Structure formats: structure tokens, C-alpha cells
UniProtKB/Swiss-Prot annotation:
The keyword Nucleotidyltransferase does not apply. Keywords: Host cytoplasm, Host nucleus, Secreted, Signal, Virulence. This is Secreted RxLR effector protein 20. The keyword Secreted applies.
């Protein structure tokens, strides 16, 4: 049986090649394998997808490209929500 991560990796590769961006495989310090393209880096998104079981199950149950693209958008919004309070709370004008 194939690992769900292999299927996820294949979907991201397919999505990257369809979008026209040149994709290449990278490995992060903690061993995550992700993709970089001319646009965004998918490593953090993949990590977020693995942390959210509902989002991950959506991808595994409905393996269409549109479901995967929607899940990536949700993961990206979640990442922005995590980072936004930190950016707003930092005042670079303090001396």
C-alpha cells in the first residue's frame, strides 16, 4: 500500500507542473520533503496539512486537483493567521 505522503507529494508535483512553475525537491532540517517552484514554497503548507486531520482527510478522500488546491489555500490562510498577530505586535519604530 502506498503511503498517503507519497500521494500528497505526487499531487503537489502535478499541481506545480500544471501551473507552469519549475519544481524541484528540497529537504528541510527536520526531514520534511517539500517542493519549491517559481512561486510559493510548499514545505510549510504540507506541514500544516499534516497537522490538520480534517484538511488532510479531505485531500485523501477526494483526490481531485481542485480539492487539493482548496486545501492548499486553506493551509495558506491558516499560516497567515498564525503569523499576522506577530507582525502586527512588532513595532520597528521603537528606539
Amino acid at each position: 500500500m502506498q503511503s498517503p505522503y507519497i500521494i500528497l507529494f505526487a499531487l503537489v508535483t502535478l499541481l506545480g507542473s500544471i501551473s507552469g512553475g519549475a519544481t524541484s525537491t528540497i529537504a528541510t532540517r527536520n526531514g520534511d520533503v517539500g517542493l519549491t517552484s517559481a512561486g510559493p514554497t510548499f514545505v510549510r503548507k504540507q506541514r500544516l496539512l499534516r497537522q490538520d486531520p480534517n484538511l488532510y482527510e479531505t485531500i485523501m478522500n477526494d483526490r481531485s486537483a481542485s480539492a487539493f488546491a482548496n486545501a492548499l489555500r486553506k493551509a495558506e490562510m491558516a499560516a497567515e493567521t498564525e503569523v499576522a498577530p506577530l507582525v502586527r505586535s512588532t513595532n520597528y519604530n521603537d528606539s
